[in-house]
Amino acid sequence: DDDYHYPSVKLEFLTAFSGADGYLRSVVTDEGETLPVVEDKTKTNIEANALVRVISNYASEVTADGTAGAVLYALSGVLSVVPQTVDKFEEGVKTDPTDVLGIWMGLDYLNMTLIVKENGEHKFHFIEDEVIVDTATGCSEVYLTLYHDAKEEVVSYTRRAYASVPLRQYAAEGIQKVMVHFSVHTYSGDIKTYDFVYNPD
C-alpha cells in the first residue's frame, strides 16, 4: 500500500524511567524532552521506580490524548556509573586501549561510542583524576580518564561499546560552568583528551 508510512525511527541515547512494576514508563531525550512510553517492544524490565541509561531505536508517536509518546523498537543498556577516585579501584587502575568513534555532550551526561577488540569481557568505568572548584567564578574543572580492563588481548574483529558519564554530581551549588576533560588511551599508543563545557541548568 503506497499510503503506508514507515515510522521515523531514531537511534539515540535516552534516560529511561521504570514504574512500580519495573517496566519502562517514560524516557527523556538528550534535548530534554520527556516522552511517555506508548509501547516497549523489547519488554525491558528493570528495578522498580529506577532510571537507566540506554541507547534505543525509537519512534515518536502521538498518544490517544494528542500528546507525544515513544515506541521503543530496540534497546541496549549503556554503561553509566559515577566516576570514582583512583583509591576506590581495589585492583588498581586499568587503562587498556580503546578507540573513540564518537563523543558528545548530552543532557547531564557525556556520551561516547567506543571501539574495542572483540575478545570476551571488557570492564569499563570512569576514573576521577582531579576536580578543581572555583566558587568565586562559579566554574569547576573535572579531569576524567576511561577505565578499561580488556582481560586477554586476543585478536580479531572489533565491536562497539556505549558509555555515558553522569555529570550532575559536579553541578554543586553556585557552579554555573563545568569544564570536562576526558582522556582515553588509544590503540595507537596515544592518550587523547576531549574537552567539553557542561552548563548545568
State what each model feature region is.
Residues D1-A20:
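Bacterial Sec-dependent N-terminal signal peptides
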Residues K41-S56:
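Short nucleic-acid-contacting surface segments enriched for D/E, G, S/T with interspersed K/R
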Residues V62-I115:
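Surface-exposed beta-loop interaction hotspot
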